[in-house]
Curated annotation (Swiss-Prot):
Family: Belongs to the DXR family.
Species per Swiss-Prot/TrEMBL record: Xylella fastidiosa (strain 9a5c)
Assigned EC number: 1.1.1.267
Residue positions binding Mn(2+): D154, E156, E225
Protein's name in the database: 1-deoxy-D-xylulose 5-phosphate reductoisomerase
Origin: domain of life: Bacteria
Length: 396
């Protein structure tokens, strides 16, 4: 019996995860149809993707670029319908336009569309970690009510998902997320004070966008992933461990109460996790070769240095505080990373700004989206205001 074609929406289509998803989808035209493509501001790149993949719908987040998108589609003779803005995207992902959503919009900007997909009961391939960090309780509740199928696309959570063959943690003693350690593993604080944005974006094993690359360099990426794992798998902080594994071949480990430990290994390529999410519980080709253990003949593990890289500690603290603290952490980090990439602050000022926000703002119960968005806005305001009180980056 032939299975129906799955209609897939790729949100964040012009980013690195979007490109990986489209690569996998293009390999299986009889199984998948790209029904919707969405991007934030890169309208020319979105138009090029529309020309290649011929989606039914295209959405540009920046409403001022709607005319450019619409006219570009018309000039190319494409039948793709143009839309703009957050509300239009949320409405489309909740409609019959798609049954599968790749949520890869970076930052809090992806929250509304991710929640809309969860409420509508879609298969949600979740690469937008901020949705879980900012509103994890709400997202998981909506998915539970609607029957949405959440499959994490982060390599670490996808590895746990594969080891468990689901998100059920019966019999699990603990899970261990691995971290590459970023480009500055082994650096001390004196060395980190001189780091430039260009250096921070040079990740040793993964190809990622600027914001995620900096998060990896500060270990905030791993901190956010600890919070994600808490929501995805329902485990407390003490059952979520982190180890630095510079080869980035073992993506996570699951230790069971009987003494067994399962690990998932693969080359560091997001196409593997995307293929898992698109086809689960079956398997499809991703374009990623298998792992040659004779070529990679050693696997190293070490504890993360949370004194030097304090973002991981701050993330754990925020998770244990609960309520709106993770939302504060996330918003302050976004502002701090943006300022660092603009050369306005030094590398070590990123955790300092985050800690300032966490100690300044009160904790509330994270029981409504309105509360979370209000806290998000207020955190951004006070973090912006605090930028002038922190030292500028050191001259090279």
């Amino acid at each position: 019996m032939t299975k129906p074609i799955r209609n897939v929406a790729v949100l964040g289509a012009t980013g690195s995860i979007g490109a990986a998803a489209l690569d996998v989808l293009a390999r299986h035209p009889r199984q998948f149809h790209v029904s919707l493509l969405a991007a934030g501001q890169r309208v020319d790149a979105l138009l090029a993707l529309c020309h290649t993949y011929r989606p039914d719908h295209a959405v540009i987040g920046d409403a001022t670029l709607y005319t450019t998108l619409r006219d570009g589609l018309n000039a190319a003779g494409l039948a793709t319908k143009a839309y703009a803005g957050e509300a239009a995207l949320a409405e489309l992902v909740a409609s019959t336009t798609c049954d599968t959503v790749v949520a890869a919009i970076v930052g809090a900007a992806g929250l509304h569309s991710t929640l809309a997909a969860a409420r509508a009961g879609k298969r949600l391939l979740l690469a937008n970690k901020e949705s879980l960090v900012l509103a994890g309780m709400l997202l998981m509740r909506e998915a539970s009510i609607s029957g949405a199928e959440i499959i994490p696309i982060d390599s670490e959570h996808n590895a746990i998902f594969q080891c468990l063959r689901s998100r059920t943690t019966d019999g699990v003693h603990r899970i261990t997320l691995t971290a590459s350690g970023g480009p500055f593993r082994g650096h001390n604080r004196t060395m980190l004070a001189k780091i430039t944005p260009t250096q921070a974006m040079a990740h040793p094993t993964w190809s990622m966008g600027p914001k995620i690359s900096v998060d990896s360099a500060t270990l905030m990426n791993k901190g956010l992933e600890v919070i994600e794992a808490h929501h995805l798998f329902g485990l407390p902080s003490e059952q979520i461990d982190v180890l630095v594994h510079p080869q980035s071949l073992v993506h996570s480990l699951v230790e069971f109460i009987d003494g067994s430990t399962l690990a998932q290994l693969s080359l560091p390529d997001m196409r593997t996790t995307l293929a898992v999410g698109l086809s689960w519980p079956e398997r499809i080709g991703s374009g990623v070769p298998g792992l040659d253990l004779m070529k990679h003949n050693r696997l190293d593990f070490e504890r993360p240095d949370t004194e030097t890289f304090s973002c991981l500690r701050l993330a754990r603290d925020a998770m244990q505080t609960g309520g709106t603290a993770p939302a504060v952490l996330n918003a302050a980090n976004e502002i701090a990373v943006s300022a660092f990439l603009q050369g306005r602050i030094g590398f070590l000022t990123i955790p300092a700004l985050i800690e300032h926000a966490l100690t300044t703002l009160p904790r509330y119960e994270a029981d409504t989206l309105e509360t979370l968005l209000t806290v998000d806005t207020e955190t951004r305001r006070i973090t912006h205001a605090a930028l002038t009180h922190f030292p500028l980056p050191l001259p090279l």
